Amino acid sequence: METQQLSAGIGEWDILIQFVLGVVSALLGYLFMQKIRKAQNKNELTLNVISGMCVAGAVAILIEIGEFFIDFYKGTNLLHADLVTNDHWLYRLVGTAMSLDGQRYLLDMDEDMLLTILGGIITTAVMCIAVRIKNKNMFVRVKKEKLKLSFGKWAEKKFSTEKAKLLKDCSAFDITFWWCTRAVMLYAFIVWENRPEAILLCANLIATFAITLIHIVFPEGTFFSRVNYRAQTLITTIVFLGSYCGNYVWLYNIVPRFDLFLHLVSGVLCVMGGYYIALTLVKPDSKKNAIIITAFAALFSFFIMPAWEISEFIGDFIWGTTNQGFYWGPSDSSFLFKVFGRGAYNTTLYPLYDTFYDVLLAVVTTIPTVVYVYLSLTSEFKKGKSLAQSKEEKETVIC
């Protein structure tokens, strides 16, 4: 009885610690970005605040990676991979919906990441309100006379505006790729109409219209209405590879290393997604801004990693699927063992191997992509600066 009470007490403290960790991480992330370059306008301030949330996600996944390797090599149990209990607060909150007991081994890890990210998100929301109150002058909107347009005129104007943005942001290849993917996804949905997987396939099909829908719904001048249309190519790529090629064409089973390839690609796509979001708020017109954009792109990728694993956990929890691969038992020929060895032969970690394998693959491609983004931004800035200098020199000579 005393042992159960002690375990419950430790569990409650762990919940509090993880949440506070998310709060502190978000605050430090915001202060760090402000230190690199103090925000001069509301867009830069917004980016710095959102960066705090991304730092919370990065801290969540990096701590879990650290605990995994300590357990892997030392044979400890920091991740509580043997936790199998129906008394957990998550079960009390939503019930034991899952049908696969193997998922319970990932419960503590996903709980920690969820609480840390939740702390970061709540802190970010509070900071958004706080900085808006503190910096009222930055958020004063210039009132413009609004012309009263009929729905037809408004729709015509909106269509022409969005068409111009689309053609500016994207190439013919991007647009062709979108529609080809939508066509094959629609065909797959029709074929799978009576299967449970059809719901997920339909959701992924809708996701290929995400950026377009965002531009239509949100008014001109808002943050969401300025997101680069090329971000839709990133979403469509991951949907095409994961949902259509992986699940419908069944490449997960046909091609042995397809999952490895997909997670390597996801690291690149997440960095580029963060890059396009940052460009919506900050112009790459200085070296400090290049650092800010690159830092946000990296943090965004590290935020998506735990968020993705949590979404897989919730999906497995509700529908009894096996997205997190907790059934996987590694062999001596496993790529993970070839790279890191067998460690302390900690068999309780086996259900967690697939999750950390996926995360590590994404990290591998995130780092070089971040370096590429920074180098390309600085080279563009230097090129623009040299062009401006040569223009000034020509004007001086003429004078």
Language-model features and meaning:
Residues 1-323, 332-399:
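Bulky hydrophobic segments
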